[in-house]
């Protein structure tokens, strides 16, 4: 597996990513997706669940992958000090979309997200301070979509 220090573009990062980051797509499937995208073909493969995964966008520093019909993974290469880190946003859609953000260092070690990004709190989505409690009480579940 390549480290981020060796792999400085999204193609290489996607191929070098640990399999647990993409449990539905083993290395060969990811390699096929990249090959199809670079050949300007529809980048689509059958994933390990028998569904379809599609590489929707592949740039030197960004990737958008539809892992299933209801889930996506976005990866963005970010400068951080004198090295790069990778931001990974995993989203799941049902009636609403929910996202989680992860950061990785040059050796694919997960970084503490709290040091790099603060998830918005539900209170930040409502303006009138006298009605916040009312709306919070109405929310059964707190979902956030990030892009």
Model-derived features with residue positions:
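Terminal domain-start segments
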Residues: 6-78
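Short, hydrophobic/aromatic-rich segments at coil-to-beta transitions
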Residues: 60-63, 83-87
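Short, surface-exposed beta-strand/loop "edge" segments at domain boundaries and coil↔beta transitions
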Residues: 71-74, 95-98, 133
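Short, solvent-exposed coil/turn segments at beta-strand boundaries
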Residues: 79-85, 145-147
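Mid-length scaffold segments of soluble, non-membrane domains
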Residues: 84-119
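Short aromatic loop motif centered on NTY/YTY
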Residues: 114-147
């Amino acid at each position: 597996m390549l480290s981020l220090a060796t792999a400085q573009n999204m193609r290489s990062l996607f191929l070098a990513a640990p399999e647990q980051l993409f449990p539905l797509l083993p290395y060969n499937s990811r390699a096929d997706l990249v090959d199809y995208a670079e050949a300007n073909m529809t980048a689509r493969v059958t994933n390990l669940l028998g569904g379809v995964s599609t590489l929707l966008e592949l740039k030197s520093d960004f990737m958008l992958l539809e892992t299933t019909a209801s889930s996506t993974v976005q990866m963005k290469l970010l400068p951080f000090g004198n090295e790069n880190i990778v931001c990974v946003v995993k989203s799941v859609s049902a009636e609403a979309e929910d996202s989680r953000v992860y950061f990785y260092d040059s050796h694919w070690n997960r970084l503490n997200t709290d040091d790099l990004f603060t998830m918005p709190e539900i209170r930040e989505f409502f303006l009138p301070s006298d009605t916040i409690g009312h709306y919070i009480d109405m929310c059964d579940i707190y979902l956030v979509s990030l892009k």
